[in-house]
Amino acid sequence: MTTALQRRESASLWQQFCEWVTSTDNRLYVGWFGVLMIPTLLTATICFIVAFIAAPPVDIDGIREPVAGSLMYGNNIISGAVVPSSNAIGLHFYPIWEAASLDEWLYNGGPYQLVVFHFLIGVFCYMGREWELSYRLGMRPWICVAYSAPVAAATAVFLIYPIGQGSFSDGMPLGISGTFNFMFVFQAEHNILMHPFHMLGVAGVFGGSLFSAMHGSLVTSSLVRETTETESQNYGYKFGQEEETYNIVAAHGYFGRLIFQYASFNNSRSLHFFLAAWPVVGIWFTSLGISTMAFNLNGFNFNQSVLDSQGRVINTWADVLNRANLGMEVMHERNAHNFPLDLAAGEATPVALTAPAING
């Protein structure tokens, strides 16, 4: 028997790099999307941390009244944020080299754009990397489809909404209380609670939580016993085992009798597709709602829609919500405008019908 040996030609440095990038044997898969994802997410993370700790106040409304968001300027973890870029900048691209100085860039909220743009590119690439790894492993592509829901939500609040409103100062602040402020102002200006797409999103998130808890509790309650009473049931499962670890027939029978027969899935694949699709579709709709309200296609207005026989208004919850909206609109950006737009747009109300007599 003769064995022929042939020396393998040494691969070029570029070829070695390509093989390393696309190798599924690495502990963490890099991928071509990862080549862009890693530097952008690192840049966004580092800038966010530095800005959250030490950024000076930002003139968010463009009226020379800076708002402090960093820890070194008196905030804590709850109240701190990376403040959105100034209304004086609007939708202009504002990298460091566009400012006259670093102080000007910080004063106008440049770090916000740097973080948001790099973050969005990073999460887009993360989604592409999920598809890429699935493709390399011969899997179906639904993981990246599910991830597209939070990606769409982030894109809506950080990019689409500011574009629709005409300024990145209207984007969501990068902090806890700043997020809540964004939600209140969004409700005041767009009545999002009365928008059908937001309602679908609420059903998706809360329904997804309910279905996840129901599924987890049913599976845990119908595990196939493989251990004794003194051992943890978790030891009854061996990674990669071929046998079912729970009795789907028992779970189906229990739930079918608890509700009714057709409320229970008898197919594990369709069940898990439903668990994935419900919250994803809901969040898609919410993202679409944010994107339409960005261009002021707002929630339903049922204010003063119920009248008695004399034409007097009978207040409904829509009217209560409208009062809350006006209150929130009065409070926010109190120095940027003299009067809330919703109140200023109505007919003028006379405050004095006749001039008072003086010394006469």
UniProtKB/Swiss-Prot annotation:
Residues of the site described as Stabilizes free radical intermediate: H190
Keywords associated with the record: Calcium, Chlorophyll, Chromophore, Electron transport, Herbicide resistance, Iron, Magnesium, Manganese, Membrane, Metal-binding, Oxidoreductase, Photosynthesis, Photosystem II, Thylakoid, Transmembrane, Transmembrane helix, Transport
Chain positions recorded as [CaMn4O5] cluster binding sites: D170, E189, H332, E333, D342, A344
Positions contributing to chlorophyll a ChlzD1 binding: H118
Catalytic function, reaction form: 2 a plastoquinone + 4 hnu + 2 H2O = 2 a plastoquinol + O2
Localization (cell): Cellular thylakoid membrane
GO CC terms: photosystem II; plasma membrane-derived thylakoid membrane
One Pfam family from the record: Photo_RC
Domain of life: Bacteria
Segments passing through the bilayer: 29-46, 118-133, 142-156, 197-218, 274-288
Site, as annotated: Tyrosine radical intermediate: Y161
Positions with a binding annotation for Fe cation: H215, H272
UniProt-listed InterPro entries: D1/D2, Photo_II_D1/D2_sf, Photo_RC_L/M, Photo_RC_L/M_CS, PSII_D1
GO molecular function: chlorophyll binding; electron transporter, transferring electrons within the cyclic electron transport pathway of photosynthesis activity; iron ion binding; oxidoreductase activity, acting on diphenols and related substances as donors, oxygen as acceptor; oxygen evolving activity
Binding-site residues, a quinone: H215, S264, F265
Propeptide, residue positions: 345-360
EC number, as in UniProt: 1.10.3.9
One annotated GO biological process: photosynthetic electron transport in photosystem II
Chain residues that bind pheophytin a: Y126
Co-factor binding details: The D1/D2 heterodimer binds P680, chlorophylls that are the primary electron donor of PSII, and subsequent electron acceptors. It shares a non-heme iron and each subunit binds pheophytin, quinone, additional chlorophylls, carotenoids and lipids. D1 provides most of the ligands for the Mn4-Ca-O5 cluster of the oxygen-evolving complex (OEC). There is also a Cl(-1) ion associated with D1 and D2, which is required for oxygen evolution. The PSII complex binds additional chlorophylls, carotenoids and specific lipids.
Marked site positions, Cleavage: A344, A345
Described purpose of this protein according to its UniProt entry: Photosystem II (PSII) is a light-driven water:plastoquinone oxidoreductase that uses light energy to abstract electrons from H(2)O, generating O(2) and a proton gradient subsequently used for ATP formation. It consists of a core antenna complex that captures photons, and an electron transfer chain that converts photonic excitation into a charge separation. The D1/D2 (PsbA/PsbD) reaction center heterodimer binds P680, the primary electron donor of PSII as well as several subsequent electron acceptors.
Quaternary data: PSII is composed of 1 copy each of membrane proteins PsbA, PsbB, PsbC, PsbD, PsbE, PsbF, PsbH, PsbI, PsbJ, PsbK, PsbL, PsbM, PsbT, PsbX, PsbY, PsbZ, Psb30/Ycf12, peripheral proteins PsbO, CyanoQ (PsbQ), PsbU, PsbV and a large number of cofactors. It forms dimeric complexes.
Further comment: Cyanobacteria usually contain more than 2 copies of the psbA gene. 2 of the reaction center chlorophylls (ChlD1 and ChlD2) are entirely coordinated by water.
Name assigned to this protein: Photosystem II protein D1 2
Record organism: Synechococcus elongatus (strain ATCC 33912 / PCC 7942 / FACHB-805)
